[in-house]
Every structure is written in structure tokens, then in C-alpha cells.
Amino acid sequence: LSSAASDVYKRQDATDPGINLFRFDVEKGTAVPVKSLSGIQDPSYLTVSRDGKFVYSVSETAVPDAKVCAYSFDKQTGTFSLLNEQHTDGSAPCYIWVDSKHRMAVTANYNGGSISVFSISADGALLPAEVYAYEGGRPGAERQAVPHLHCVYASPDENYLYANDLGTDRIYKYEIVASDKGLSLREGTPASFSLPVGEGPRHTVFHPNGKWAYLISELSGRVALMYYDKGNLTPVRFVEADTLHVSGSADIHITPDGRFLYASNRLKGDGIAIFSIDLENGQLTKIGYQLTGIHPRNFVITPNGKFLLCACRDSHIVQVYEIDKQSGLLKDTGKDIRVSKPVCLKFTDM
């Protein structure tokens, strides 16, 4: 097979939470279970190193239990081996990013109002965390009284790191500094970017051309087109993804050819908003809406752009949709992958 899915799921309220590995045929849209890894409490998000040799998963719990687990991954056998664990010292880590050469890992700690920065040793193990805590919020505001960090990600050239704060409507910016000791963060100039009050920034994705970034805001249900230039992100237009205004927008991804963007919504009218992208200026045009199973918290697009896999947490399935290459619309293949409480999906070659 040209690619296999390291489709990973948090089974949040299941009897045996953990990570499931499937071999996914990216031409036929079918999945075969390979291995499962149990015993991780609330593994709500993970990332795979670019070379596919390491997996890093958060355990979205409260301090002092909140942590990151580092695993080596054997592509031949599909075996995970625990390297080590490190505490985040920030409650509810819900997102993790690792640089392309796996020298640094960073988590967004939702209830901790912080990010945790870990250096990674040559064998893939994590060193203790350095915590960056934030302040602010609107007293009395529902879900925005205090900082709630929800996502960390890098610029395409990995010169900058950004942290989305749902609680304060800010995107924090850092320079990623390389030295003989590894990578470190330095406060950017400016240190942050402000968004309209009540946006609630959640996840961000860069366009393949590296010039545009798209932000899905959980509370407003809008997608922001942001122009990227020398480390700065400038919002230029907002479009609605959630027309029901229930403050449950979740995930966002772009097809490999850069022509279509998808954004998921939860809580009511669960589904995925579909947009075409103007390749001249990055502007979005809404072209459709695909209803999904219940609570589509996370989804991925296959590396060849043929399928979209959607983790429907409360339907206990991963739905497999075929992407129409011309229109961008989705067609349910009916080839559901059944798993308890799926919430995070990742691909890696095997």
C-alpha cells in the first residue's frame, strides 16, 4: 500500500482508552486493524514525527497527572514502545506539535492557560517541560473568563511558533531559535495578534503555498483567512462555517492540491462545511455542507487527497468520505471504521 493510517483515537469514556492503529488503503478507502495500545488516560491528541519513527500523545487530565507520552514506532510490526513520560505542569493538554526534525515538542494546555515546551533527546525521549503561562480574559464571560490555550503550530518554514488562546481571542507568537543545544522559544514582535471579541480561536491550518493561514474559531463558528508575511498573521476576511451559531466548531483541513477547505461543527447540525479556495487570493466560497455522525471533533485527509476520514466521537465511528476532485464535495462511502469514542486521527506511511 502506498500509505497506511496511523489512525489514533482517544476513547474518552471507554473502558480501555488508548491508541488504535489501522492499515488504510488510500485507493480503496478500506481499513484493517493492526494493533492497539491501551492504558493511556484521555489521549485526546497526538502527533507523529515526520519520519514516522516516534509518536507523542497527550493525556488530557488535570495536574498533577497531565502529561505527554513518547513512543517509538516500528513501521514493520506496527509496535509502539514507551520511551518516557513527562508532566506538562498545565492541566488538560489538548494539542501537541513537534518540529520536523523532532527536536522540540509543545503542548497547548486548555485548563492550565499555558503551553509546555519539551526538548527531545536523540532517542526521541522528552526532557522536562518549560511552561509559558498566560493572563487575561473577560470576567463573567462564558468560556472566556480565563485563558484557554487550544492549539500550537509553526509557520511553514518553522521559524515561528503560534499558540491559539480561545479564552482571550489572541494568537501568541514566538520565534523558534536554533542553537547547538537544540531549539528554544523567544517572544515574538509583536508578542500576539488580537482577534474580534468572542471568536474563540481553536485550530489553524496553512495553505500548501505557505502564504495563507486559515483559523477555525470554536465560539463564533467562523473561518478566518489570514495572510502570512515574515512571521505575522493578518486576518483579512471571516466566513461562516457554523450557520446555527452553537459555538461548537472544531477542526479544519485543506486538500493537498490547495483547492478545497473543510471545517467541522459539533453540538447541533453536526457536519463539515465545505469551501473552495480562490488560488489567486485565498478567499473562500462556501460550496456545501456534509452532515456527519455525532460530534465530529477531528478529521484528516489522505495524503493523496482522495478520502476524508471523520472521527465522530459520540457515534463511535470514523466515517470515510470520498472527495470529488472536481467539486470538492464529499460522498459517504459507507466504509465506517468502528471504534469507541474516536477523537484524533493521524496518517503515517508504513
Where are these regions (language model features)?
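Beta-rich, blade/repeat-based domains predominating
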Residues: T15, I40-D51, D89-H102, E135-E158, ...
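Short loop/turn segments immediately following beta-strands, especially the blade-tip
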Residues: R23-G29, Y71-G78, F118-L127, E175-S184, ...
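Blade-loop segments of beta-propeller domains
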Residues: P33-V98, H102
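Short glycine/acidic-enriched loop and turn motifs that connect beta-strands
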Residues: R11-A14, T61-P64, N111-S114, T168-D169, ...
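Single conserved hydrophobic/aromatic residue that forms the stacking wall/gate
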Residues: L1-A5, Y9
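A short beta-strand motif characteristic of beta-propeller blades
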Residues: V32-S38, S81-Q86, E130, G136-E142, ...
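Loop-centered beta-sheet repeat module
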Residues: Y160-E218
